[in-house]
Amino acid sequence: MISFIKGVLIEKDPTALLIDVNGIGYEVFVPMTTFYTLGDIDSQVSLYTHFVVREDAQQLYGFKSKVDKKVFQELIKVNGIGARTAIAILSGMDSKTLLHCIENKDYALLATVPGIGKKTAERLVVEIYDKLLKMANEIYAQTSGTTTTSQDSQAQQAPTSVVLANSIFNESVDALLALGYKQKDAEKMARSAMGDATTVAEVIRKALQGSIKSKR
């Protein structure tokens, strides 16, 4: 069981990282709330991890905090919620927002996550309600995962060429597709979030936040 990983960040794409640990490269899948907190390539990274073994694959999932890891582990215990859907949930909202959804039984907001319909949202609330409430103090104590990184802050001040903008748009669409959104929806979300955004992380963050706000 791999419960924690610390190493050098070699590659980072939305939802997937490559981390060098003493010469061995580990592919780690992460929610966007963790991706937002990462430093630059070649920087040190430490993640709490959950190892999933299936018949056709062995996959490692990483989280910025032990609390997010626990929430993920509770999510995948829910009937109909797999690891990919759990990652999509924690990409669209942090643990605190998820707790609010569960407390308020906000089925409509939960159903905005790709792969979750109304029935699955209702089942999720029923099955995870008590467990998440027991974790409330831990969830509220942790820092929000949507803090802008220094890299994002610097990027916001840099000019964006048409070529770079197109690259950011295409990468953002690919990331949203990886989270389970349909092509048409992913393009619409990325386009509406572009504005003056100059990084993929910034576009995706705005796109996911915009999707949540539109349902409230």
UniProtKB/Swiss-Prot annotation:
- Using the UniProt annotation, give all residue ranges assigned to the region (Domain I): 1-64
First-listed, main subcellular location of the protein, grouped into a coarse class: cytoplasm
GO MF, one term, reads: ATP binding
- Which NCBIfam families is this protein grouped with? ruvA (TIGR00084)
> Region Domain III: what ranges?
164-216
List, alphabetically, the GO terms of the cellular component aspect: cytoplasm; Holliday junction helicase complex; Holliday junction resolvase complex
The protein's matches in Gene3D superfamilies, at most eight in alphabetical order, are given as: 5' to 3' exonuclease, C-terminal subdomain, DNA helicase RuvA subunit, C-terminal domain, Nucleic acid-binding proteins
Protein name in UniProt? Holliday junction branch migration complex subunit RuvA
Instruction: List UniProt keywords, sorted A-Z.
Output: Cytoplasm, DNA damage, DNA recombination, DNA repair, DNA-binding
Q: What Pfam families does its record include?
A: HHH_5, RuvA_C, RuvA_N
Family of the protein in this entry: Belongs to the RuvA family.
Q: Which GO terms describe its biological process?
A: DNA recombination; DNA repair
Q: Which residues form the signal peptide?
A: none
Q: Which residues lie within the region annotated Domain II? A: 65-143
Q: Name the source's superkingdom.
A: Bacteria
Q: Give the location in the cell.
A: Cytoplasm
- Assembly and partners? Homotetramer. Forms an RuvA(8)-RuvB(12)-Holliday junction (HJ) complex. HJ DNA is sandwiched between 2 RuvA tetramers; dsDNA enters through RuvA and exits via RuvB. An RuvB hexamer assembles on each DNA strand where it exits the tetramer. Each RuvB hexamer is contacted by two RuvA subunits (via domain III) on 2 adjacent RuvB subunits; this complex drives branch migration. In the full resolvosome a probable DNA-RuvA(4)-RuvB(12)-RuvC(2) complex forms which resolves the HJ.
What does the function comment of this entry state?
A: The RuvA-RuvB-RuvC complex processes Holliday junction (HJ) DNA during genetic recombination and DNA repair, while the RuvA-RuvB complex plays an important role in the rescue of blocked DNA replication forks via replication fork reversal (RFR). RuvA specifically binds to HJ cruciform DNA, conferring on it an open structure. The RuvB hexamer acts as an ATP-dependent pump, pulling dsDNA into and through the RuvAB complex. HJ branch migration allows RuvC to scan DNA until it finds its consensus sequence, where it cleaves and resolves the cruciform DNA.
SUPFAM superfamilies recorded for this chain?
DNA helicase RuvA subunit, C-terminal domain, Nucleic acid-binding proteins, RuvA domain 2-like
Annotated region (Flexible linker) at 144-163
**Native organism:** Francisella tularensis subsp. tularensis (strain SCHU S4 / Schu 4)
User: What is said about the domains?
Assistant: Has three domains with a flexible linker between the domains II and III and assumes an 'L' shape. Domain III is highly mobile and contacts RuvB.
